[in-house]
Amino acid sequence: MGSSTKKKKEKKKDFQKTKLKVGKTKAKPDNFTDTSFRAKTITLNQQSLHITAPSSDAQFTHHVSLLSSKSDTQRRDSLAHLTTSFVSRPVDSPLPQPVSVLLPTLLPLILDASSSVRTQLLKLLRALPANDIQDHVPQLLPYIRAGMTHLAADIRVSAVEVLSWLVYVAGAEVVSCAGGWIKTLNCFLSVLGWHTEESSKWSGNRASFGKSGAKGQPMVKVLAALAVFLQAGIGRPDDGMGDSSDEDSAMGVSGWEFPLCHAAQHMVPQATAPFVHLNLFGQPRDEEGEMYETREDRYRVFENRFLRAVQRGLEGARSEGGEVGRASAGVSKVLKEAIAYGPGA
């Protein structure tokens, strides 16, 4: 009996709360680990003990490799480091790596889910030399168009901002490269919801930009980018181009065709293939993927395929008033000047 009573007491001991006596500390558990020590040094097995720090080129290459990291913060910080290295470099000095090497890593970030990464990417792109970007416009546009048709509203707005920068840097290359005119205009109409006449009658098909679009700020950015894009594609040529002709006429150089009318139409054309748009002897072609190098070709395509849709959309945007109405006025101004100038003199 004594042994069984002792076992019962030991089992009950685990479920009984011990009474603490005054002046005595609580007993420490059996699995207690003392953490009161302080380490003077921490030794890492793979710690680098190089005396010399890595060079700036090595750091640049390291941060380029981190652009594909899974961490949003790491990608943003790497973009910030690259931007600082671009801005702080001496004038007329080459980049640590050519733009052709950097773009394949940078371009997928246009579709990044993190807004901070996309904002930092735009800052980096603006720090790149403009002359180096002009040769890589066909490589940039597919990612921009993919962003403009993305499901996320924030990514669509960020892609429009990148397109505005690209038109400012290389507007002629953007509108004249393969697919740069028709495909980009289709993306604009898709973002704005101006594609068909039926879409303007139904509120469900109108442009939606989520919570950020409540005040119309994204719509203003898209309309401003559309105005810049149309100005680069079908805008009235600069007056500076006509100054030389005025000077020539004043000197009596351009008056040789009098009294003939439209003499320039019967001269040898300046374009390489003036009748290529007729496609007289060629196979059926993809109009969306073609290159429209002259303003006349771009205006002809715009008038046939997009003019009515843009005019109809501008009327609806003007009726909204506010900042959206003012932004639509800028697009209307460019459009009126282009229509007044026509396909060209």
From Swiss-Prot:
UniProt keyword terms in alphabetical order: Nucleus, Ribosome biogenesis, rRNA processing
UniProt-listed SUPFAM superfamilies: ARM repeat (SSF48371)
Keyword Nucleus recorded: yes
Pfam families: Ipi1_N (PF12333)
Compositional bias segments (type: Basic residues): 1-11
One annotated GO biological process: rRNA processing
Annotated GO CC locations: nucleus; rixosome complex
Residue ranges of the region described as Disordered: 1-30
UniProt subcellular location: Nucleus
PANTHER family (UniProt xref): REGULATOR OF MICROTUBULE DYNAMICS PROTEIN, TESTIS-EXPRESSED PROTEIN 10
Subunit structure: Component of the RIX1 complex, composed of ipi1, rix1/ipi2 and ipi3 in a 1:2:2 stoichiometry. The complex interacts (via rix1) with mdn1 (via its hexameric AAA ATPase ring) and the pre-60S ribosome particles.
Protein task: Component of the RIX1 complex required for processing of ITS2 sequences from 35S pre-rRNA.
Family: Belongs to the IPI1/TEX10 family.
Protein name: Pre-rRNA-processing protein ipi1
Species per Swiss-Prot/TrEMBL record: Neosartorya fischeri (strain ATCC 1020 / DSM 3700 / CBS 544.65 / FGSC A1164 / JCM 1740 / NRRL 181 / WB 181)
Gene label: ipi1
